[in-house]
Amino acid sequence: MLAVRSLQHLSTVVLITAYGLVLVWYTVFGASPLHRCIYAVRPTGTNNDTALVWMKMNQTLLFLGAPTHPPNGGWRNHAHISYANLIAGRVVPFQVPPDATNRRIMNVHEAVNCLETLWYTRVRLVVVGWFLYLAFVALHQRRCMFGVVSPAHKMVAPATYLLNYAGRIVSSVFLQYPYTKITRLLCELSVQRQNLVQLFETDPVTFLYHRPAIGVIVGCELIVRFVAVGLIVGTAFISRGACAITYPLFLTITTWCFVSTIGLTELYCILRRGPAPKNADKAAAPGRSKGLSGVCGRCCSIILSGIAMRLCYIAVVAGVVLVALHYEQEIQRRLFDV
């Protein structure tokens, strides 16, 4: 089960999710139908040596093309939407228009669907980065619970492992017998981990030399994190090419705001060293609850943080899948149909 316990990691996940939703909204609903495609045009009557000019659909000009004869013998993926607004050249009643109208009649030689480029580059990179960051969060939480962590106050007690609690509930309710093997195993693991953390903080180089597997695990965790953040930040640096003329200014501003905020948040999380907690004896409450109320409180907290969170994740994933399946045809129609 994945539960984002760190507020810093949760903020990054929320920012990446919001960034992806903004891109999906613009791709599906926000783009004007006249600003979806760009065309490589040349004014009618000019020589074939004249350089092609990329422009978006302009209602003051007449675009001539050949929608029934795809370029290079076949359509590009979803390129038919770009040729839908063109006029077939053979229906124009004159072969060579007057000089006064030459500059208002354009021959289209190529068309590009810019929403297709946005959908298959930026949106995909954001989705991959989102899953990679969740993978990093899962690896980091497992390392905090079972692995070597420095500083030591970041460690999470292995006894809080959900499988341990579930095993005790099943054994006590159904088997009517206390099951403590997992608890004893986790206690032994906690003691051994304390010793490893002390050795690591004393001499990290020698520790990693004699235990390279731990270094590989930590390295994989860091690589996954940097790759995820790199993919998200890299979406702002993808060359837009000629499609830049179709993207509005607010999309550029929104992209840089999200990317810079995510990058600065991750940089702050890496550089920030949280203060060590106060002494447990001083921080402990003088009147710690005991008896039935304490047991019920601990059980309720474990249930809410474990089973309830699992149900929430299942509900969210199921909701996303149902919405995607329900609106799949509508999204495809808005993206790639006329």
UniProtKB/Swiss-Prot annotation:
Main location: host cell
Its membrane topology: Multi-pass membrane protein
Cellular compartment(s): Host cell membrane; Host endosome membrane; Host Golgi apparatus membrane
Keyword terms, alphabetized: Glycoprotein, Host cell membrane, Host endosome, Host Golgi apparatus, Host membrane, Membrane, Signal, Syncytium formation induced by viral infection, Transmembrane, Transmembrane helix, Viral primary envelope fusion with host outer nuclear membrane, Viral release from host cell
UniProt PTM comment: N-glycosylated.
Signal peptide (from-to): 1-30
Renumbered residue ranges of the record's region Interaction with UL20: 265-301
Domain of life: Viruses
Extracellular membrane side: 31-121, 234-243, 323-338
GO biological process: fusion of viral membrane with host outer nuclear membrane; symbiont-mediated induction of syncytium formation
Glycosylation site list: N48, N58
Cellular component annotations (GO), alphabetically ordered: host cell endosome membrane; host cell Golgi membrane; host cell plasma membrane; membrane
Keyword Glycoprotein appears in the UniProt entry: yes
Annotated TM spans: 122-140, 213-233, 244-264, 302-322
Short name of any one Pfam family annotated for the protein: Fusion_gly_K
Region Involved in fusion, residue ranges: 31-121
Record topological domains on the Cytoplasmic side: 141-212, 265-301
Subunit structure and binding partners: Interacts (via UL20 interaction region) with protein UL20 (via N-terminus); this interaction probably plays a role in the coordinate transport of protein UL20 and gK to the trans-Golgi network (TGN), and is required for the cell surface expression of gK.
Function: Glycoprotein that probably modulates membrane fusion events during secondary envelopment of cytoplasmic capsids that bud into specific trans-Golgi network (TGN)-derived membranes. Also plays a role, together with gB, in virus-induced cell-to-cell fusion (syncytia formation). Seems to block fusion of virions with infected-cell membranes.
Family per similarity comment: Belongs to the alphaherpesvirinae glycoprotein K family.
Full protein name: Envelope glycoprotein K
Provenance organism: Human herpesvirus 1 (strain KOS)
Lineage, broadest ranks: Viruses, Duplodnaviria, Heunggongvirae, Peploviricota, Herviviricetes
Gene name of this polypeptide: gK
